[in-house]
Every structure is written in C-alpha cells, then in structure tokens.
UniProtKB/Swiss-Prot annotation:
Start and end residues of each Fe2OG dioxygenase domain: 78-178
Protein name per the record: PKHD-type hydroxylase Bind_0236
Top-rank taxon: Bacteria
UniProt entry keywords in alphabetical sequence: Dioxygenase, Iron, Metal-binding, Oxidoreductase, Vitamin C
Pfam families for the chain: 2OG-FeII_Oxy_3 (PF13640), PKHD_C (PF18331)
SMART domains: P4Hc
Cofactor: Fe(2+); L-ascorbate
Entry's EC annotation: 1.14.11.-
Signal sequence bounds: none
GO terms (BP aspect): DNA damage response; intracellular iron ion homeostasis
Provenance organism: Beijerinckia indica subsp. indica (strain ATCC 9039 / DSM 1715 / NCIMB 8712)
Chain positions recorded as 2-oxoglutarate binding sites: 169
Length: 226
C-alpha cells in the first residue's frame, strides 16, 4: 500500500528545515546503508549526532503524531528518528530493499521496519530527476511530491531514486514499526477506517456505524502487537 499524505509540514516548518540544513555538515550517505545498498547509494546525509538532525527530527515526529491520515494508514508503534539526505546533480540510489531491522546511533532503539517513509523538503520546481520509484505487485510508481508532503510504502518494496539532473533534492526519510506487522492486515484496517470516516460524514448517527467501529477495533485488538 502506497499512500500520499499531503502537507505534513507547513510552510514555516519547511522553511526552518531548509535554513537549518543549509548550515549542516553533510557526510557520505553510505554511512547508514547496508552492505548491498552501499554499492548503489550515492548521496549526502546530515550526521545522526548533529544538533540539526535532532531539532528537525523532533519537529517531524511531532507533526506525524498529530496527522490523522498518517496514524490511520500506518498505525505506528515506533517512529525511527528521521534522517535527512541530499541528492546533488549526478547523485542517485540504485534499486534496493530497506534493512529489516534498524538501530539508532547509540543502540538505545531498535525497530522492525514495517513501513518506509520519505518526506519531501524540496519541491519539483527545485530539481529535475530524483524521482522515487517504488515497485509493487501492480507495477512501478514514480513519485516527486511538493515540499512538506509524505509518501509511505511497505518497507519490503524494491525502490530506487533516479539521478538528479538539476538542482538538489532534499528530504527526510525514516521507518516505522507498526502495531500491525502484516501489510495485508494493515491495508484492510486502513480501508475500513477510511470507509467509516466517509460514512460518518454522509450518514452520521446511523447505528450501523457503531457496529463497523466495533469490527475495526476488534480486528485491531486481535492483530496488534504492543
């Protein structure tokens, strides 16, 4: 399930991210890549230990926990502290699958990566190329979103970033351990929750809505891993 979540960050927050990232000390992005990914990764990252990384990461996580669409689609258990990357002209990231388990720099946090996420901090007008292409059972999907928008997709998906041909592509990327490990179950719950919200707008007060909400929460209770 690939979901586009618009306007996770507002204009002021995007401007703050860009200002802070302009003064950051960028390093080779391969420092966070697995053995296989290291062979195809060519970008820059903010060091995880930098104050810029901590400030911006905390801002993004707060925004995510207050975003209803993100909560509904992901059902997050733990959000990995966001990382930040930059692709300049000629840089890209070949086809790969994200590492199944991620740990932070000091080893105090370890998560199962159920969902991958990219939060765009530069818009399509800022660069050419740099499309994020995700492969699933229905084919390939190429994504270039406005600054502040988020794309989420199953972490077991093959994906790649095309080389940038103009400008710089800056983004935050991170992973989420969901309450629901199985992506099929997670998708069913998201579709059910979406239908309930639409029915609430159209036929508020209908007793059947209470039954549907009960089905949703009982499935969540049965499948959730706390």
């Amino acid at each position: 399930m690939i979901v586009h979540i618009p306007a996770v960050l507002n204009a002021e927050q995007i401007a703050r991210c860009r200002a802070v990232m302009q003064t950051g000390d960028w390093i080779d992005g391969r420092v966070t890549a697995g053995h296989q990914s290291r062979l195809v990764k060519n970008n820059l990252q903010l060091p995880e230990s930098s104050p810029e990384h901590q400030e911006l990461g905390e801002m993004i996580v707060r925004a995510l926990w207050h975003n209803p669409l993100f909560i509904s689609a992901v059902l997050p258990h733990t959000i990995f502290p966001p990382l930040f990357n930059r692709y300049d002209v000629g840089m890209g990231f070949g086809t790969h699958v994200d590492t199944a388990v991620r740990r932070n720099l000091d080893g105090s946090l370890r998560i199962r990566t159920d969902v991958s996420a990219t939060l765009f901090l530069a818009g399509p007008e800022d660069y050419d190329g740099g499309e994020l292409t995700i492969e699933d059972t229905y084919g390939t999907h190429s994504v270039r979103l406005p600054a502040g928008d988020l794309i989420i997709y199953p972490a077991d998906s093959l994906h790649f970033v095309s080389p940038v041909t103009r400008g710089s592509r800056i983004a935050s990327f991170f992973w989420i351990q969901s309450l629901i490990r199985d992506k099929t179950q997670r998708n069913l719950l998201f579709n059910l929750d979406t239908a309930i919200m639409r029915l609430t707008e159209d036929v508020a007060g209908n007793p059947a809505l209470v039954s549907l909400q009960g089905v949703y929460h009982n499935l969540l209770r049965q499948w959730a891993e706390i």
